[in-house]
Design a protein with these regions (language model features):
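Alpha-helical transmembrane segments and their immediate juxtamembrane cytosolic regions
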Residues: 1-363
């Protein structure tokens, strides 16, 4: 016996599509040396628009996880466990494949010796897997307490372990070096410091858990008006708390600080409420087609964009298009942005064909 599937919210697809389009945009400039400031990540402490796209997607993944597990009444069974483990492993392995491809195409051999173990897809996999397992084994009313305790413990680790300085003594870097080894980590300015490392995945899981709990609030509401009221309330409280606490705990994406989790979850909740009001209540949907095409096939198009980006870079095609065409016409910075926008349009043309044909690639 399964529960009724909740009515699909178009706003959720659109927010998912906006974040995926944003991830593709910021990951594929024509030149990393010519990127406008809002499209760059904060150097360390701080928050830019670019810093929002990944945590927004993790928040949305939490809501999607709620919808998915609701069909099974959130009950533990071998079938549900197999589904969770299978999806977790598949997403994680796709991330490993992307890292191996990126390393191998430039060294011209299968480079396992310097294979980066973690990354965006791996973080998504762990966030989904842990949240799903907790959701089918623990009462959902305990989610806020689990999130708060996790973030509090992580803050203590950062505070006592030089966690708010970008240095080799940072506890996040030290733990990851110990657990993964420097040859299997991302290197930031020559230093082994992985922004999707193992220790910082602990608070990142909280992003998915907050999204999951917001999914519970969403689909237990009696109508769309109550949905946006709940989301705006949660969003306002979290955003205010995040910025207030940032005076003692800096907002920092690289270490995924507790205030980064709280603030970005608050902003994501508020933005989703705004989209529900615009799209699902007011019915202003004419502009949605572009982002919906991304939103219904999110992981597929993200993986496609990563693979194509690697191949374009390895063959020199991206450099040729940027330097010989776009820079000549537009200049360095506008040309770099134009390349990223054209790449987003290229990816959209692929995923829009799938959308029009009703093809949804599930990972």
């Amino acid at each position: 016996m399964t529960a009724n599937t909740p009515k699909r919210l178009l706003a959720l697809d659109i927010l998912r599509g906006i974040t995926i389009a944003g991830m593709i945009l910021v990951n594929n400039p024509g030149s990393w040396g010519h990127v406008y400031t809002p499209l760059e990540h904060a150097a360390f402490n701080g928050l830019t628009p670019t810093d929002l796209v990944f945590p927004f997607f993790m928040f949305i993944m939490g809501i999607s996880t709620y919808i998915s597990l609701r069909k099974y009444n959130f009950t533990y069974s071998h079938a549900t466990l197999r589904k969770i483990v299978k999806r977790t492993v598949v997403i994680f392995c796709i991330g490993l494949f992307l890292n191996l491809l990126a390393k191998s195409v430039f060294t011209h051999h299968l480079n396992f010796e310097e294979l980066r173990y973690l990354g965006v897809m791996q973080r998504l996999a762990i966030g989904y897997g842990v949240t799903s397992l907790v959701a089918i084994t623990v009462k959902h009313k305990y989610f806020p307490a689990i999130i708060l305790v996790t973030l509090a413990v992580y803050f203590l680790l950062l505070a006592m372990g030089d966690g708010f300085n970008l240095s080799a003594t940072n506890i996040v870097a030290r733990f990851d070096v110990w657990a993964l080894g420097t040859s299997h980590m991302y290197h930031d300015g020559g230093m082994a410091f992985d922004p999707e490392g193992l220790l910082s995945t602990l608070p990142a899981v909280c992003h998915v858990m907050v999204g999951f709990y917001c999914g519970k609030l969403l689909f237990s509401a009696k109508d769309n008006d109550e949905k946006i009221q709940r989301l705006f309330l949660v969003g306002t409280i979290l955003t205010f708390a995040g910025f207030l606490l940032s005076y003692g705990c800096p907002i920092n994406k690289k270490v995924w600080s507790p205030t980064f989790v709280i603030t970005t979850c608050g902003l994501a909740s508020s933005f989703l409420a705004l989209l529900i009001w615009i799209i699902d209540i007011k019915g202003y949907q004419g502009w949605c087609v572009f982002f919906r095409s991304f939103g219904v096939n999110p992981l597929f198009i993200y993986v496609f964009a990563e693979i194509m980006g690697i191949l374009l870079g390895a063959t020199g095609a991206s450099v040729f298009i940027y330097e010989k065409v776009l820079v000549t016409v537009l200049g360095n910075y506008p040309g770099s942005l134009a390349y990223a926008l054209l790449y987003v349009l290229f990816c959209w043309s692929i995923v829009h064909i799938l959308y029009k044909k009703g093809i949804y690639v599930k990972i």
